[in-house]
């Protein structure tokens, strides 16, 4: 009825023929003189980020970004950050509400890391990490804060090669927090990999690859603090 009454335009021309085909990605559609905005479908992606990619849409130094790995038509943004030298689980989406939900500290979404450090970690070191450590807010400030209690366990120690591997679970996600926590107990980080965000695990996702989240996975993430 709207078409027959001449109320619909495509690319500036009135459409009067029923069944007219359009390309929603290219054609401009108007109804009663007002442009009809396309409602973009929300997409949710889990990426196993490699080392060497920055977590940003565009980098001022032309370094590779995570969007170079996920080439889709939707305009997606990273959910949180992983520094250039950290690999592992990173979500991307075009749903702003979802980003706020996952990244806001009040929601306390857990992130689990596998950390390889120089030296042999003791049980005393583990307790210090569990109880929270005072670390700098950033490299440019003298301001510090005490990290929230973390879940920590030793996965491996190798006295011959002089390294330890830990699993650390936090929910704050401050800038380079896990690295700074390890530095606070005198341990240099040799490798850092984010294994999980909440219950999303990248163990079966090849490094550099990505997949869409299922509806159930998105639902579980949105219900985390309910």
Question: Where is each model-derived feature located?
Answer:
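Basic, flexible Lys/Arg- and Gly-enriched helix-loop patches that mediate nucleic-acid binding at interfaces
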Residues: 1-226
């Amino acid at each position: 009825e709207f078409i027959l009454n001449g109320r619909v335009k495509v690319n500036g021309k009135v459409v009067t023929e029923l069944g007219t085909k359009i390309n929603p990605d290219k054609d401009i559609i108007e109804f009663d003189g007002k442009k009809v905005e396309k409602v973009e479908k929300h997409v949710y992606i889990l990426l196993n980020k490699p080392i060497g990619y920055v977590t940003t849409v565009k980098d001022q130094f032309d370094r590779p970004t995570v969007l170079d790995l996920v080439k889709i038509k939707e305009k997606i943004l990273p959910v949180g950050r992983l520094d250039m030298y950290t690999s592992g689980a990173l979500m991307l989406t075009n749903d702003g509400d979802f980003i706020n939900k996952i990244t806001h500290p009040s929601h306390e979404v857990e992130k689990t890391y596998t950390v390889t450090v120089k030296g042999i970690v003791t049980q005393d070191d583990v307790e210090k990490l569990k109880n929270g450590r005072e670390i700098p807010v950033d490299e440019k400030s003298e301001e510090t804060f005490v990290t929230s209690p973390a879940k920590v366990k030793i996965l491996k120690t190798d006295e011959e090669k002089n390294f330890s591997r830990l699993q650390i679970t936090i929910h704050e996600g401050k800038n380079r927090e896990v690295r700074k926590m390890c530095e606070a107990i005198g341990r240099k980080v040799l490798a850092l990999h984010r294994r999980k965000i909440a219950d999303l695990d990248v163990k079966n996702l090849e490094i550099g690859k990505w997949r869409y989240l299922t509806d159930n996975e998105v639902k579980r993430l949105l219900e985390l603090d309910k």
